[in-house]
């Protein structure tokens, strides 16, 4: 969880969950209230007023879309609940929407979900028409790192050709050309 006032961080915390805590839930979607309440508890414990202009959550495994920031809507929520794969990231937009909906004039967003699809046609070839290319990668992290690197180099992400690897809870590699992972 992170709370910013403009570009100033007011709170940055990583909330971890034990296997035992999560084992009481048969499906990831059942963890919704648990995870939402932890966010609210963290805000309260740090005396952060529940008064926001926008709430952004980690994007889920919705239908493939280009990279960017998206406002949470009913179709996205439906796709997230009935996603092609089960992952905790599917709760990010749902939690953001629930929190935002309790505040006047507050909007909910996701950014660069793991299904960002910017592949060129040649990259879709798998060797068999029975095995279509499914694009799932750590887009949020990789694009953020690429943008930071570009700033440090005094240039724009869109002007660079890179190879980026995410080595965290999962592993993925992307080859962005001019700001689009191909």
Q: Where are each of the predicted segments found?
A:
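Short, well-ordered coil/turn elements that cap or connect secondary structure elements
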Residues: 4, 10, 49-50, 103-105, ...
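Short, basic, glycine/proline-bearing loop/turn elements
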Residues: 23-29, 78-84, 130-131
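Short, well-ordered amphipathic alpha-helical segments that serve as non-catalytic structural scaffolds
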Residues: 34-46, 95, 145
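Phosphate-binding/catalytic loop of phosphoryl-transfer enzymes
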Residues: 89-182
